[in-house]
């Protein structure tokens, strides 16, 4: 890690992590992941450039590894396993890949009651709550943002942590999410494995996302014996759907097993708002009738009206004045991220 915390018996916080160039193999910023009796709070992560050099990724030339030529273990840019009241704003996150214990997602919000080799669950009070991620750009990664409440250990002998709730993600760009970065190329994973107190109250609003065209916009799941998730708000986003837009993550007893967007969303969440999104290039197998109502479905990228799409890799995603999605948000703003505001937020991040 470049910065780590959340594994102690003392009350930590407030934290300000600002104006840094952060480079690390595992995670550039990590809170949690071990034994703790208290949770770090009031954390601001502002105006940082998160970075992993491509020389660390096997297959690249030149390749730089550790002793004996083994590759470094790469996980993600930001992972929260034990943190409350967190603001992540105006960060640039470049280059992340899977191939080890993770699959290339740039950001993980995953409260964890860490399981030790001796069989102990050492952080039942760990939680990730009240997190806002805004005006942030994640690029060149195996996946976008993962929001998961999972059991520790192998999922059989482990135990849940305390809470995963109240996540707000807005005015974020996720581009060049690609399977070539040893991941699924999915924009969002939303999954619960806790029997009680499930993952809940997630807002994804005004996000522009380009998952791998052969992959997914969202992977979701929750076993039928668990308490259902609730409180999903997915609105005003502008995102490619991928070939398999809303896909199952938890096997044959999962709420998302049928892989049909409206069915999966309805079965996985007892309460949700999923509307006023621009869902780009939906495949023929998933026409508008298989989605929640009140969404928009541009059939091609050209129908959106980006200033410069650039194949979803470093483009200018501000909407042209002629775009049919200009000022079409429920708040009167453009669908997708506030690109002008994002560029201003990142102007001095190098």
Segments predicted by a language model, with ranges:
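Right-handed parallel beta-helix
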Residues: 1, 5, 10-28, 39-59, ...
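Short, recurring structural edge motifs at helix starts
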Residues: 5-7, 33-35, 77, 113-124, ...
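A structural signal for short, well-ordered beta-strand segments and their strand-loop junctions
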Residues: 30-31, 88, 318-319
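Short, well-ordered beta-to-alpha junction loops that form the rim of enzyme active sites
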Residues: 31-34, 82, 149-150
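A short local loop/turn or secondary-structure capping micro-motif enriched for an aromatic residue
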Residues: 37-38, 98, 154-155, 327, ...
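Acidic, glycine- and Ser/Thr-rich low-complexity intrinsically disordered tracts
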Residues: 68, 72-73, 227-235, 239-350
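Leucine-rich repeat
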Residues: 181-191, 215-222, 246-258
